[in-house]
Amino acid sequence: MGCRLLCCAVLCLLGAVPMETGVTQTPRHLVMGMTNKKSLKCEQHLGHNAMYWYKQSAKKPLELMFVYNFKEQTENNSVPSRFSPECPNSSHLFLHLHTLQPEDSALYLCASSQ
């Protein structure tokens, strides 16, 4: 099987907690090929200043990818450039995905805090 035929599945578990928590993530599930470009959206209505993206790979601990505080990126744990966050305002944080690799198959989660 050639590399061109290999697809990378990015799965997002969304809505795992009740909607009244004030943090939502869309789309609920995302499957994409290695050449596609897609985005995940995180939205919070809690008035929090900080927002986060996490990655949970199979049989690995939860990994912090990006931290934004007051719309400014304060942490990036050497995340590959094929993942690019965007924080247009204090209640939205996007994770743009492109040219994914097989090792990118994971559960991606967002969160917010004071």
Curated annotation (Swiss-Prot):
Whether Signal counts among this entry's keywords is yes
Compartment list: Cell membrane
Cystine connections: C42-C110
| Domain Ig-like stretches | 22-114
What task does this protein carry out? V region of the variable domain of T cell receptor (TR) beta chain that participates in the antigen recognition. Alpha-beta T cell receptors are antigen specific receptors which are essential to the immune response and are present on the cell surface of T lymphocytes. Recognize peptide-major histocompatibility (MH) (pMH) complexes that are displayed by antigen presenting cells (APC), a prerequisite for efficient T cell adaptive immunity against pathogens.
Q: Where is the signal peptide?
A: 1-21
Q: Does the keyword Signal belong to this entry?
A: yes
One GO cellular-component annotation of the UniProt record comes to:
plasma membrane
- What GO biological process terms does the UniProt entry carry, in alphabetical order? adaptive immune response; cell surface receptor signaling pathway
Q: Which SUPFAM superfamilies match?
A: Immunoglobulin
The protein's name is T cell receptor beta variable 4-2
Subunit annotation = Alpha-beta TR is a heterodimer composed of an alpha and beta chain; disulfide-linked. The alpha-beta TR is associated with the transmembrane signaling CD3 coreceptor proteins to form the TR-CD3 (TcR or TCR). The assembly of alpha-beta TR heterodimers with CD3 occurs in the endoplasmic reticulum where a single alpha-beta TR heterodimer associates with one CD3D-CD3E heterodimer, one CD3G-CD3E heterodimer and one CD247 homodimer forming a stable octameric structure. CD3D-CD3E and CD3G-CD3E heterodimers preferentially associate with TR alpha and TR beta chains, respectively.
Q: Which residues are glycosylated?
A: N76, N89
SMART domains noted in UniProt: IGv (SM00406)
Sorted alphabetically, the keyword list is: Adaptive immunity, Cell membrane, Disulfide bond, Glycoprotein, Immunity, Immunoglobulin domain, Membrane, Receptor, Signal, T cell receptor
Q: Show the Pfam families listed in the entry.
A: V-set
